[in-house]
Each structure stands twice: as C-alpha cells, then as structure tokens.
Amino acid sequence: MKDLFLFSSLLDASHTFSYFFHIGLVALIAVIVAMMATRSMQLVPRGMQNLGEAFLEGVLSMGRDTMGSEKGARKYLPLVATLGIIVFFSNIIGIIPGFHAPTASLNLTLSLAIIVFVYYHFEGIRAQGFVKYFAHFMGPIKLLAPLMFPIEIVSHLSRVVSLSFRLFGNIKGDDLFLMVILALVPYIAPLPAYVLLTFMAFLQAFIFMILTYVYLAGATVVEEGH
C-alpha cells in the first residue's frame, strides 16, 4: 500500500524532513494555543483561557493523586503538562489528512522517554542523596542485594522501552488503521474512525503524563521506615 499524500513532501520528500517539519508544526501549534490561552487573562476565564485552566487543573489533580501532595504535583506540573501537550498535538495532527504524527516515529517517543528517565533519576538522587537512592535498588534484605540490584536496573531501563514503544506502537497502528479506512471508504465511513482516533490521542497523552508522575513519585517520595 502506498503512503498517503503529505504536505511536507511538496517541499522535500525525505522522511527526515517530514519528521522535523511535523515536529516544528506541533511546536508552533502549541505556542499559538498557549498564546491564545494567555493573551487576555481574566478573573473569570472564558474561551481558550478556560480550556487551558481546565487542562492544567486536571494535570494538577492527577499529580496530587499520584504524588500524594500539592507541593510535589505543582513542582512537576510544568514538565508533565508540557509532555502532555507535545504528545497530544503530535498524536492529533496525524489524524488530519496530509499530515503525519511525529509520535508514530521512535525518534520522538524514545527521546521523550529518555528525558523522563533521566529526569526522575536526577530528582530521586537530589531528594534522597546518591547512596540512599540507589540503596533502594538492593531491596530490604541485604543477602538478596546482588540479585535485586540488577533486576531493579533492568526494571528501570524497561521503563524507557515501555514509555517509548507503547506510544509509538499505538500511534503507528492508528496511522495504519486510518490509511486502510481512507483507502477503502474515503468519505462518510471514516467519521467513526476519526472519533476513535481522537479518543486514542487523548488517552495516550494521559497515560504518558500519569506514568511520568508515577515514576517521579517512586523516585522522590520517601516512605517512612526507609
């Protein structure tokens, strides 16, 4: 099956150009939406400001439930909300004919996963100290430390694979699904598919955000008795 037409191919047909073109487009859309939401701030929010505040409050509520505190939720709100915006717009743009979802490429999903991986370890070390943070990797029983430490290392590395491939696989699958639907029935029938794919774009962004909060909570929240 041939690839669907992409507007970026009018400038350059290479996959590398297409990837960076759509990444740049997502960044531009995010900036425009942010400017619209903050252009004329009012005490009683309306329009885009209302939508933006609802989004941030939703992310903050997610953070409170995951981190267990308002302080932790607010501290990581900029990172988690930014990741959510990038992932959502990268997902949703692929639903529009003539555009390609950047999250259907491992280049983006793996990059985002590595950012989360490095950052939550950095925050964990900063919150607990280097020795205490990695002492948790050895488990509560010292005799089992030689076994538990490599298992924990593999477990944490697998989070990069989980974050990146889950998002990549779902969005790539959505792209292929949409391509088949448009090839078979290009007019009225794809409408239910667009609804489903829009829901999936929201869902994958939500999952990425909540997993980021979960990993940050696991790294920075020190349980009593440890």
UniProtKB/Swiss-Prot annotation:
Q: Which CDD domains match?
A: ATP-synt_Fo_a_6 (cd00310)
Which GO cellular component does the record give, naming just one?
Answer: proton-transporting ATP synthase complex
Q: Does the keyword Transport apply?
A: yes
Subcellular localization, as worded in the UniProt entry? Cell inner membrane
Q: Mainly resides where?
A: membrane
Q: Which Gene3D superfamilies match?
A: ATP synthase, F0 complex, subunit A
Q: Which UniProt keywords apply?
A: ATP synthesis, Cell inner membrane, Cell membrane, CF(0), Hydrogen ion transport, Ion transport, Membrane, Transmembrane, Transmembrane helix, Transport
Give the way it sits in the membrane: Multi-pass membrane protein
Query: Among its keywords, does the record have Ion transport?
Result: yes
List all membrane-crossing ranges. 17-37, 79-99, 105-125, 134-154, 176-196, 199-219
| GO MF entry, a single one | proton-transporting ATP synthase activity, rotational mechanism
A Gene Ontology biological process annotation?
Answer: proton motive force-driven plasma membrane ATP synthesis
Q: How does it assemble?
A: F-type ATPases have 2 components, CF(1) - the catalytic core - and CF(0) - the membrane proton channel. CF(1) has five subunits: alpha(3), beta(3), gamma(1), delta(1), epsilon(1). CF(0) has three main subunits: a(1), b(2) and c(9-12). The alpha and beta chains form an alternating ring which encloses part of the gamma chain. CF(1) is attached to CF(0) by a central stalk formed by the gamma and epsilon chains, while a peripheral stalk is formed by the delta and b chains.
User: By its UniProt entry, which PANTHER family does this protein fall under?
Assistant: ATP SYNTHASE SUBUNIT A, CHLOROPLASTIC
The free-text function statement in the UniProt record for this protein reads: Key component of the proton channel; it plays a direct role in the translocation of protons across the membrane.
Q: What family, per the record?
A: Belongs to the ATPase A chain family.
Q: Cross-referenced NCBIfam families, in alphabetical order?
A: ATP_synt_6_or_A, PRK05815.2-3
Designated name of the protein: ATP synthase subunit a
Q: Which organism is it from?
A: Campylobacter jejuni subsp. jejuni serotype O:2 (strain ATCC 700819 / NCTC 11168)
Q: Which gene encodes it?
A: atpB
